[in-house]
Amino acid sequence: CGPGIEEAVRNYAESLPDAELAELLIAGVTKAELLDRADVQESLTLRTLGADDCLLAPLPNHLFTRDTSSWIYGGVSINPMCRPARVRESVNEEAIYLHHPRFADADFTVLGDGVGSGFASVEGGDVLVMGNRSVLVGLSERTSPQGVERLALQLFEAGEAERVVAVEMPKARAQMHLDTVMTMADEGTFVKYAGLGMLRSYTIRPGDAKRPLHVEANAPERMHAVIAEALGLDSMRVLTTPQDSLAAEREQWNDGANLLAVAPGAVVVYERN
């Protein structure tokens, strides 16, 4: 909001009861609302804004909580988001994990601080905890190679994982995250959008004194074999919908491959599919 009114905004926020502060951090505040509620000094920022312009923008995507943090074995990654409109969501998420009474006595590792640097973004929809101390991550339009490297380092240093497999996805709005095209149904079964095809992948393991990470590139045709190896299996089962390409594409737009496994072989899906 600019240094000219930073102190006024902070003082206003600190004066609010808990519920109103939460509303401010999620719903934001306009110039007119702030002038009506706070003692604001001279500010170039204010002079250039219209009455209904936001000083603190609302966070309408905050409902998609699977993106801002990812529980990975015994730790939680507070993810640096890709789009500027969602960056503050991770700040709010961090405050919850660090200060909410529900987590005060919990024993878990906090990975990252939710504030990305440059292109280092990771969104939870691209993170799949497979088991066998392995993690599958989609290199999508929202999760960058830099972000995956940083996450892998944090996981290895904390002892939460031993292997990260990154799959190079198409950079397309229709396949925004890995979980829109591929999810697990049980320990060795995946449901996959037929149009996804086989993807180039990278196996990331802890490095040594000379290099922090060991990265191995895998050919697209080895995609399933690489994932099976990470799971400690000889092979994996892949299920796709028995439809023609047009019908499959239409169902994928409705997240047809987006399952939530609540137990091995027991999944929650969208009724529309």
Task: Locate each region found by the language model.
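The feature marks the mature, well-folded catalytic cores of soluble enzymes
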Residues: C1-N273
